[in-house]
Amino acid sequence: MNPLIFTMILLTVMLGTAIVMTTSHWVMAWIGFEMNMLAVIPILMKKYNPRSMEASTKYFLTQATASMLLMLAIVINLVYSGQWSMTKPLTSTTSIIMTLALAMKLGLAPFHFWVPEVTQGVQLSSGLILLTWQKLAPMSILYQISPTINLDLLLLMSLLSILVGGWGGLNQTQLRKIMAYSSIAHMGWMTAIMVYNPTMALLNLVIYILLTTTTFMMLMMNSSTTTLSLSHMWNKTPLLTTAILTIMLSLGGLPPLSGFTPKWMIIQELTKNDNMIMPTIMAVMALLNLYFYMRLTYSTSLTMFPSTNNMKIKWQFSHKKPTANLSPLIILSTLILPLSPMLALLE
């Protein structure tokens, strides 16, 4: 793709998200979503092949359906309130339809089926944009409508997402699918706390984006897309492989790593609101996520796949890539937990 055209497309994606996050007019928010969706499709098809074509088509159909539901909710809200402003409280019907539309855009269960398929069909760089940047706009709208959102519906989808994210990641050998199911589970944690403490949901989003970005950047450096290629990284970049596995455990929520921080704070916040059953179920389901990450770490680090002798000296001939920006990302992705007492100020 021409670098100038690619830059313009990236700017359009950013502009669409910025419009959604800053506007207080429902039509402008819808336009922002459409700009973002149409601009991100060429990024998904950056490497043109049948798989990326199929992934882009699935993404377009899902997002177009979500946009249609969103516009339906906006029109119903206009009929009831007579205003386009996002500051006005939503009616119950509008709230349910809008929650479903945003759940479809975020990839919450039961609207999650497109996330693993699309992520698996695109390049690692496109998958990074899909699982990080594309979550910002829907989450900002959820944040704004959180006071009038349907609590029961959102909690049900949150529990389903955490369960699906845990079950789906089991027996996966493709790293992009593992990251996609991890994304579904993390979205479930964020939406579970959205009504009780929206600021904490945003904190969870920031930590999730940080962890996912670091993981994808390190996978891109070695073009690793399967557990087999990840295990061969020991011969090329042993320190980087150790960092990847540590951050994957952080994504699974293993204490004392950074990924444990939002889970701990969310469970604490839910129990403060006299909601005991929900955090108990969420904590048990989160063990599924941690299990497949620990199994991935075990199979990669403690068991060696068969390899030829010349693979064992591959690190001597590997091309050195710049890693200056990875150091702060790795530190933040593993060592945020000691800062969590300061995060209590969010409450």
Swiss-Prot record:
Transmembrane regions: 3-23, 25-45, 59-79, 96-116, 122-142, 149-169, 178-198, 200-220, 240-260, 276-296, 326-346
Molecular function per GO: NADH dehydrogenase (ubiquinone) activity
Keyword Transport on entry: yes
Keyword NAD appears in the UniProt entry: yes
Alphabetic keyword roster: Electron transport, Membrane, Mitochondrion, Mitochondrion inner membrane, NAD, Respiratory chain, Translocase, Transmembrane, Transmembrane helix, Transport, Ubiquinone
CC per GO annotation: mitochondrial inner membrane
Reactions performed catalytically: a ubiquinone + NADH + 5 H(+)(in) = a ubiquinol + NAD(+) + 4 H(+)(out)
Subcellular localization: Mitochondrion inner membrane
Protein family per UniProt: Belongs to the complex I subunit 2 family.
Designated name of the protein: NADH-ubiquinone oxidoreductase chain 2
Topology class, membrane: Multi-pass membrane protein
Enzyme class label: translocase
Assembly with partners or alone: Core subunit of respiratory chain NADH dehydrogenase (Complex I) which is composed of 45 different subunits. Interacts with TMEM242.
GO terms for biological process, alphabetical: mitochondrial electron transport, NADH to ubiquinone; mitochondrial respiratory chain complex I assembly
InterPro entries on file: Complex_I_Subunit_2, NADH_DH_su2_C, NADH_UbQ_OxRdtase_chain2, ND/Mrp_TM
